[in-house]
C-alpha cells in the first residue's frame, strides 16, 4: 500500500476547497427533530449538507446541476442511487484496510444516521462509474426476463392481475420503533 504525506500543493488545494464557495445549489435544510437525530447532532451535523465533505458536496452539486439542466429522470435516478455512498457516514473496513481483500469502504451503517469517528471519503467520479456499470448490468439482466415483473399497489378487490399468475409476493413488514420511516 502506498501512503503519501501531503505536500504544499496538497495542502493548498485542501485550503482552496475548504475556503471556497460552492457555486452550485445544494440542500441546506436543518435536520428535523426526531428520535434518532442525536447521532448526527453528536457528530456536529445539524444541516443536511454537513453529511458531506466540502469536496464531495462541491462535486455532487456540480453533477446534480448538470443532470437537472438536462431534465433526464434516468440520470436523476442514477444520481440518487449513489449519494448515500458519498457521505461522511461511510465507515472504514478495518480488516480490508490493513490486510487487503476487497475495498476498504464498508459503506454506511444501514437504518441509522451514524457518523463514524474514522469516516472514509469516496470519490464521486468512482461512484458515478460504479453506478453506470451497475445500471448496465441491471438492464442486461432485465432483457433476459420473459415476462415483465408486475408491481401493484391498488386495492385487492380491484386487481387487474389475472388469477393464478402471481409467482412471488413481497411485503414490507412493520418494524415498530426499530426503523424511522419519517
Q: Over which residues does each language-model region extend?
A:
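Nucleic-acid modification enzymes, centered on SAM-dependent nucleic-acid methyltransferases
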Residues: 1-162, 180-182
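Metal-dependent catalytic core segments for phosphate chemistry
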Residues: 168-182
